[in-house]
Amino acid sequence: MLRVDQTGTILIKNGTVVNDDRYFKSDVLVENGIIKEISKNIEPKEGIKVVDATDKLLLPGGIDTHTHFQLPFMGTVSVDDFDIGTQAAVAGGTTFIIDFVIPTRGQSLLEAYDQWKKWADEKVNCDYSLHVAITWWSEQVSREMEILVKERGVNSFKCFMAYKNSFMVTDQEMYHIFKRCKELGAIAQVHAENGDMVFEGQKKMLEMGITGPEGHELSRPEALEAEATNRAIVIADSVCTPVYIVHVQSIGAADVICKHRKEGVRVYGEPIAAGLGVDGSHMWNHDWRHAAAFVMGPPIRPDPRTKGVLMDYLARGDLDCVGTDNCTFCADQKAMGKDDFTKIPNGVNGVEDRMSIVWENGVNTGKLTWCQFVRATSSEAARIFNIYPRKGRIDVGCDGDIVIWDPNQSKTISKDTHHHAVDFNIFEGIKVTGIAVTTIVAGNIVWSDNKLSCVKGSGRFVPRPPFGPVFDGIEQRDKVRNELLRKVDRKPYEDDNTKNSSK
Ligand code: URQ
Ligand code: ZN
Ligand code: ZN
């Protein structure tokens, strides 16, 4: 599809700019992909594209911190690839995604990184970056982590505590990985579920004849997420390095994060659109396809309170930035687990509907202000991953990634109208009020009037420098705590014989 405007230059008039600290009426001029001027009554130069944003909000382009496009996983490949996935992203107002390189155990991280980057560079329709998963530990991994940080623009590494016998690492390996993250100034991310207990829970369910999707949640209740979340935070804090819990899916896990934050631990939590927009009761649906569509890990929780409580945490700033974990599989792929839920490829959609789901469940419920919405869907992610204010803010010099948002327009989410490749939408039938009517990437319109106008492969890889704001003050915290570790000077122990012989 040809982009309607290749110049990266556009004038947006009469909108209300919303950043995470304030909002104000203004025109915005983007030139060659960079925001050039923000002021009232900017006169358009000859030939410049002008868009009227009267009664609309201008938001910083959304940032999705967690996607898995075309991920080889559980014997298949997720169907939203970097082209379709980023089309769906911009159709919902997201203009920057961070995907995951996931090396197989024993595979070179650099080799896997190069493969993922090749896949992405050929297809992305918006800017992107890459986290790297650490699925094994060795001197080689340690060396390659340094190269990824110093030469490839990676500042985040993910450990899986789940997926025993595939991605899962031990506590001891995680300890060494976290130490390495600290040395390199990279944030340690964790998929926090007790993988050994999940493995036992899965066996138990199958032995009991519970083979359907409901067995997925029953085998890995939220206690296993909360326990692993606590363990990951304790290990990270023992190293005194910032830790980021991905896809926080339960009240239990959120409570653990809150407890440690109150004690001054540098921990961040990422809720996802699924956990903020639906609940896990769908896994008990009598239609197998419907139930299997909601299978992901950690499970979307059946407790109906969860989505509201997670939104409350997000509003208070006790959870930080919203991802999606977009990892989609069609019916025939999910059916690989039709007789055994442990074989259902884990993953759901989210990248297109994320911002409207957060607006509907956050702003329209009175829990989030406009500014808090921007924080949750864009700027906090940019800060944590050290690309603020290039991304996550509408200001002079920032990237021209802008969403024209209509807070009063509604739509009903459906697989029949979404832009994903997947044949199911976990938000099916949900009416949302608050949608992206125009999405601008690097000063070019890529979504408008309900139509995409992307240029495949036009997105850029954005390197993320180490030692971002998440590391501020970490050394001092470490120093103060280490000063408390003192040895006691005492006389050497003497048993009675030694005592008598010295008299
Ligand atoms: O665990 C993840 O984040 C990846 C493998 C996607 N699948 C999922 O169920 N979350
Ligand atoms: Zn995960
Ligand atoms: Zn994931």
Swiss-Prot record:
Its cofactor is Zn(2+). Zn(2+) 2 binds at K158, H191, H247. One of its GO terms (molecular function) is zinc ion binding. Carboxylation allows a single lysine to coordinate two zinc ions. It comes from the Eukaryota. GO terms for cellular component: cytosol. The keyword tRNA-binding does not apply. It catalyses: 5,6-dihydrouracil + H2O = 3-(carbamoylamino)propanoate + H(+). Gene3D superfamilies: Metal-dependent hydrolases, Urease, subunit C, domain 1. Its EC number is 3.5.2.2. Binds 2 Zn(2+) ions per subunit. Pfam families: Amidohydro_1. Zn(2+) 1 binds at H66, H68, K158, D325. The keyword Transport does not apply. One of its GO terms (biological process) is pyrimidine nucleobase catabolic process. Transmembrane segments: none annotated. Substrate binds at Y163, N346. Belongs to the metallo-dependent hydrolases superfamily. Hydantoinase/dihydropyrimidinase family. Catalyzes the second step of the reductive pyrimidine degradation, the reversible hydrolytic ring opening of dihydropyrimidines. Can catalyze the ring opening of 5,6-dihydrouracil to N-carbamyl-alanine and of 5,6-dihydrothymine to N-carbamyl-amino isobutyrate. This is Dihydropyrimidinase. It comes from Dictyostelium discoideum (Social amoeba).
